[in-house]
UniProtKB/Swiss-Prot annotation:
Designated name of the protein: UDP-3-O-acylglucosamine N-acyltransferase
CDD domains linked: LbH_LpxD (cd03352)
Species name: Vibrio vulnificus (strain YJ016)
Enzyme class: transferase
Record text on subunit structure and interactions: Homotrimer.
Pathway info: Bacterial outer membrane biogenesis; LPS lipid A biosynthesis
Role this protein plays: Catalyzes the N-acylation of UDP-3-O-acylglucosamine using 3-hydroxyacyl-ACP as the acyl donor. Is involved in the biosynthesis of lipid A, a phosphorylated glycolipid that anchors the lipopolysaccharide to the outer membrane of the cell.
NCBIfam families for this protein: lipid_A_lpxD, PRK00892.1
Reaction it catalyzes: a UDP-3-O-[(3R)-3-hydroxyacyl]-alpha-D-glucosamine + a (3R)-hydroxyacyl-[ACP] = a UDP-2-N,3-O-bis[(3R)-3-hydroxyacyl]-alpha-D-glucosamine + holo-[ACP] + H(+)
Length: 343
C-alpha cells in the first residue's frame, strides 16, 4: 500500500504544513467519512463547521479555515487542486495491461518503445508505432500506420483506425473508437453515394477521452483534438471538427462536422453543436445547449429549459406555442397606443 508523509504531501501540493511532518496517510476520503490514515480536504467554507468532528489524519484547507482545525493540516491555495494532486499520488487504479500477452497479435514491422504493455487479444497492425511505456488494454485494435505517443494508456476494446495520431500522456477509456468514417455522402437523385473519408484524426498530448466516445476521421483534412482536452463518455465528434487547447466536454454532447471550438471552452453535457460554425475561446455552454450559430465572444450561454413540475412545464410549452400569436397581438396594441399618442 502506498503511503505518504505530511512532508511529502506538502512537497506534492506546495502547501504549508502544520503538525507532525512524519505522520502518514494512504488514502484520500471525503471529510465526513475520513478516518485514521486518510487525507481529506475542505474547499467549501460552509462545511468548515464539520472540521471539529473530522477524524482524518490530515486536512488540506485554505489559510482562513486553519483556525477551525487543530490536527495535522496542509494550508494550500486551492484545496480541490491539492486533492487532485494527492489523489494521483495515491492512485491504486491497476494498469490496463502488464507485459505483452501471448494472445496479442503484433505485426512484425510494428515499432514498440521500451516497457510497452499489450493485453490479451489486442491487434497491432503493420506500420504502427507505440512510444515508451504505452499500455494497450485487452481486445484493442490499432490500425495500420497509427502512432501512439509515450505514456499513453488505452483501456480494453479501444479501436484506433489506420493513420490516427495520438500524442503522449493520453488516457482513453474502454470502448472508444477513434478514426471511424465521418458521415459524408452525396445525394444523386435520391441515391446516397458514400464519400471516402481520406483524412485522419490527430490528438495532442495530455488528452483524456471517456468510454464509448467516437471521433470520426476527416473527409479530406484531419479531425484535430489539441493538447490538454478532456472529453467525457459517449460523445460524438464528427469529421473535421477542431477542438482547442484545454477545452472540456461532459457526456452526451454531439458536435457536427467542420466546427471549430476554441481554447478553454466548457461545453455542458448533452449539448448539440451545429456543423460549420466557430465557437470563440473561453465560451461556457450550460447543459443541453443547442448551438445553431457561431459564437464570437467568450461568456456563458444557455438554451436548455430548467426543470419544472409537469404542470408548470405544460403551461410553459403551451405559451411557447402561442408566442407568434401573442407577438402579433402585442404589436397591434402598440400600434393603437402610438396612434392615440399622435392624436
Amino acid at each position: 500500500m502506498m503511503t505518504l508523509t505530511l512532508a511529502e504531501l506538502a512537497k506534492i501540493t506546495g502547501g504549508e504544513l502544520h503538525g507532525d511532518e512524519t505522520v502518514c496517510v494512504s488514502r484520500v476520503a471525503p471529510m465526513d467519512k475520513a478516518g485514521e490514515g486518510d487525507v481529506t480536504f475542505l474547499s467549501n467554507p460552509k462545511y468548515a463547521v464539520h472540521l471539529a468532528e473530522c477524524k482524518a489524519t490530515v486536512v488540506m484547507l485554505k489559510a482562513e479555515q486553519r483556525k477551525h482545525c487543530s490536527g495535522h493540516v496542509l494550508v494550500v491555495d486551492d484545496p480541490y487542486v491539492a486533492f487532485a494532486k494527492v489523489a494521483q499520488a495515491l492512485d491504486t487504479t491497476p494498469k490496463p495491461a502488464d507485459g505483452i500477452a501471448p494472445s496479442a497479435v503484433i505485426a512484425s514491422d510494428a515499432i514498440l518503445g521500451q516497457n510497452v504493455s499489450i493485453g490479451a487479444n489486442a491487434v497491432i497492425e503493420t506500420g504502427v508505432s507505440l512510444g515508451d511505456n504505452v499500455v494497450i488494454g485487452a481486445g484493442c485494435f490499432i490500425g495500420k500506420n497509427a502512432t501512439i505517443g509515450q505514456n499513453t494508456k488505452l483501456w480494453a476494446n479501444v479501436t484506433i483506425y489506420h493513420q490516427v495520431q495520438i500524442g503522449a500522456d493520453c488516457l482513453i477509456q474502454a470502448g472508444t473508437v477513434i478514426g471511424s468514417d465521418g458521415f459524408g455522402y452525396a445525394n444523386d437523385r435520391g441515391e446516397w453515394i458514400k464519400i471516402p473519408q481520406l483524412g485522419s484524426v490527430r490528438i495532442g498530448n495530455r488528452v483524456e477521452i471517456g468510454a464509448c466516445t467516437t471521433i470520426d476521421r476527416g473527409a479530406l483534412d484531419d479531425t484535430i483534438i489539441e493538447d490538454n482536452v478532456v472529453l467525457d463518455n459517449q460523445l460524438q465528434i464528427a469529421h473535421n471538427v477542431h477542438i482547442g487547447y484545454g477545452t472540456v466536454m461532459p457526456g452526451g454532447t454531439i458536435v457536427a462536422g467542420s466546427t471549430t471550438i476554441g481554447k478553454y471552452c466548457a461545453i455542458g453535457g448533452a449539448s448539440v453543436i451545429n456543423g460549420h460554425i466557430t465557437i470563440a475561446d473561453g465560451v461556457n455552454i450550460t447543459g443541453m445547449g443547442m448551438v445553431m450559430r457561431s459564437i464570437e465572444e467568450k461568456g456563458v450561454y444557455s438554451s436548455g429549459i430548467p426543470l419544472q413540475t409537469n404542470k408548470q412545464w405544460r403551461k410553459t410549452a403551451a405559451r411557447v406555442h402561442r408566442i407568434e400569436e401573442m407577438n402579433k397581438r402585442l404589436k397591434a396594441v402598440e400600434k393603437i397606443v402610438e396612434q392615440k399618442k399622435e392624436d
